[in-house]
């Protein structure tokens, strides 16, 4: 049939799930933040903490039968101490926040053509590569008082 695509191609799984699982497999990242990686920063979370979310993306080649996506993943790296009542003031640890940001960038720069499988849902994907879209940018975090650096990656991946 003319104009039909390969119907066996699966849509890639949620980029946030795959990117988080990838980060959990990178010791350069987990040596700094352990498993403190999610799509939002919980109040009073253990720190340091890596927050990531999908902010769009595109098909690598809209005319191809292969469903390969390029997902844009902004990330926030937090470190320090939460403030509390009384004299317990928040503490912004910019050194650890930038170390976490640089660890993510280093891991992404070194990674290519790997397979990721989530432990809880057995979701699988192939990550072809990461592109570093934004290098560490210091953010003055007024609301939390924590150290914060912002970075962004683009992840090229597909379902398997």
Regions flagged by a language model, labelled:
Residues 35-46:
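Short acidic low-complexity segments
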Residues 45-55:
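Charged, often glycine-rich, active-site loop that binds/positions anionic groups
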Residues 1-33, 53-160:
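Charged, amphipathic alpha-helical segments and their flanking helix caps
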């Amino acid at each position: 049939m003319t104009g039909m695509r390969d119907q066996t191609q699966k849509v890639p799984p949620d980029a946030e799930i795959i990117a988080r699982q990838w980060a959990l497999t990178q010791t350069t990242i987990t040596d700094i933040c352990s498993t403190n990686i999610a799509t939002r920063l919980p109040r009073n979370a253990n720190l340091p903490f890596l927050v990531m979310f999908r902010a769009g993306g595109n098909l690598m080649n809209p005319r191809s039968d292969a469903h390969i996506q390029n997902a844009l993943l902004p990330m926030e790296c937090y470190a320090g101490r939460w403030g509390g009542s009384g004299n317990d003031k928040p503490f912004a640890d910019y050194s650890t926040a930038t170390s976490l940001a640089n660890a993510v960038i280093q891991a992404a720069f070194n990674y290519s053509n790997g397979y990721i499988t989530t432990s809880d849902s057995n979701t699988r994907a192939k990550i072809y590569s990461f592109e570093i879209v934004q290098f560490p940018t210091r953010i003055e975090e007024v609301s939390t008082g924590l150290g914060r650096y912002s970075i962004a990656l683009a992840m090229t991946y597909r379902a398997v």
